[in-house]
Amino acid sequence: MEPEETLESESSEKSLFSSQQEYEESQEAEETGAENPLLQPTLTGDVEGLQKIFEDPEHPHHEHAVQLLLEEDIVGRNLLYAACMAGKSDVIKALAKYGVNLNEATARGYTLLHCAAAWGRLETLKALVELDVDIEALNFRGEKARDVAARYSQVECVNFLDWADARLILKKIITKSSLIITDPEKGPGKLFKEDKSTILNACRLKNEWLESHPEASISEIFEQKQQLEDIVSPILAKMSTPRHFAAS
């Protein structure tokens, strides 16, 4: 199911997920016949051609390469959205090297991740997540990319984004637990040396587990999350308990 006419009446949302052909036509119309020179290499996945434009000072479009890349159509889409619609993950990876903001959103809050999710471009989603885009970004409906994928019945994309979210949750808990040690104000009280060591070791082991298990299932990830919480929670509870000292 392609997200073409199933969106609601807001014209900008319809246009955001219009067909690749319509995207090209809109670009040509806006440029009054002068097509954006980055459009074709973006849509065809010509990474070498794009790199030449960005890296060869002698190329006629080199000086304005970033400006051309970020040039928006009437609904606020630049060529990165075209790459997402076309499923050109290699193009996204290549263009990311030139300092573009992969989290930038249209006026209605649609990010590249939302776009790739709506179109069912699984490999593009994977590339964007690998590049650390914000998977929690919300559009004007309050939808994450995962919700948009579900709306268009992009099952593989939903499953992948659920998996990416599970990894993010574990990373956040690791970070929060580490902050108890590195930033004492984040904790509820004074931390004993042995407890500090316990938390540090647990966080280190969970980070190592994440790095060494890139294909871990959602249930395995949540099992690791639970293990970490089972270690940290009793320590936090102990820190929160008032200490009573015997009178001398």
UniProtKB/Swiss-Prot annotation:
Feature: compositional bias, Acidic residues: 1-10, 22-33
Record's subcellular location: Cytoplasm; Midbody, Midbody ring; Cleavage furrow
ANK repeats: 75-104, 108-137
GO CC annotation: cleavage furrow; cytoplasm; Flemming body; midbody
Keywords: ANK repeat, Cytoplasm, Repeat
PROSITE patterns: ANK_REP_REGION, ANK_REPEAT
GO-annotated biological processes: cell population proliferation
InterPro entries reported in the protein's UniProt record: Ank_Repeat/CDKN_Inhibitor, Ankyrin_rpt, Ankyrin_rpt-contain_sf, HSP70_C_sf
Pfam families, alphabetized: Ank_2 (PF12796)
Keyword Repeat: yes
Region (Disordered): 1-42
Protein role: May play a role during cell division.
Entries under PANTHER family matching the protein: ANK_REP_REGION DOMAIN-CONTAINING PROTEIN (PTHR24201), ANKYRIN REPEAT DOMAIN-CONTAINING PROTEIN 66 (PTHR24201:SF15)
Name of the featured protein: Ankyrin repeat domain-containing protein 45
Organism: Mus musculus (Mouse)
